[in-house]
Structures are given as C-alpha cells and as structure tokens.
Amino acid sequence: MEKVTIVSEIQPPQNDKERKTRERVACFLKHPNEEKFTLIEKQYGITVPWWWIEEGESLEQAVEREIKEEVWFLHIKKIKNLQITIQLERYEQKQDLNLHSVSHFFFAELFDLEQQIWEFNVIWEEKEAVLSKITPQVIKVARNSFAKNLDIKHRKELIKRS
C-alpha cells in the first residue's frame, strides 16, 4: 500500500491543539459502457466522489453505501481498493483543532446507469480530463493545504491504478 502524508504549509498543525482523525473514501467511478469516470460538482467545485466513513463500517461498505446514497446509482459491478492512502495534517481554525484526514482511494465500476434522484451534477470524463479537472478543485477544497506537496506523480498514480 502506498501512503502519502502531507503536512499543510498554509495551515500547519499547532502543537497545543487537540487532534481529531477523520477517515473517508474517494472513488473513481467508471461508466458502465464507456471509458469515462465520474466527477461531481459541489458548491465549492468539481471533485471525484468522496465521503466520510461511518462508525463500524468497512471501507468497501462505505464506498457502496455512498455511491447509492450520494450519487444515486443503484447497481455496482465491482469495487477495488487502489491501495493508495493520502493523509493530510492541518489546523482547522473553525473547529480550533488539528485535523488528520485519511483518504482511501477506490475504483468502482457501475453495472448500469439506473439511478434515483440526483443530489449533484454528475459529469462523465475520460481519465486525462479527470486528472486535469480534479487537481485544482482538490487543492481548492483542501484550502491549498497540500497544493505544493501533492506532485504530478501521485495524481497520475491514482488514475493509473483505476
């Protein structure tokens, strides 16, 4: 398993603050009939689908649950752990604590496009477009916390493993 740990240069952890760990799954979700992957458009930008893991839930269970709950696709063909984990250490001013975010990356393929109601605008893109579009948005979402440290090698590795 490849692990990348990034310490924010913009919001570095503070020695005297409580540390809270949050784990989440991020998923490269493949279209059932085309070589395209989904992006979701949220209020802060475009990203791959990602979600917090609930207590007592396995990583795979979180991926399956959230695909159904958040992007509303009903039939998942397969889920594969990409064995890549990105850990981000930063100070969260709003909560006045150090936040340790652990993101586990997955690939999932849909059986079909049957879905329920849309919560997000889902965009289907080819691998290269996903790589080019997600990078600025991930950086924005993380408030530039790891922009200087997450190099192109790691972004390409995420796409390559899916």
Predicted regions and their residues:
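Active-site segment of metal-dependent pyrophosphate-handling enzymes
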Residues: 73-113
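NUDIX/MutT-family hydrolases
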Residues: 104-107, 114-147
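Conserved Nudix-box catalytic region and its N-terminal flanking loop in Nudix hydrolases
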Residues: 34-74
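Acidic, metal-coordinating catalytic segment for phosphate/diphosphate chemistry
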Residues: 1-26, 32
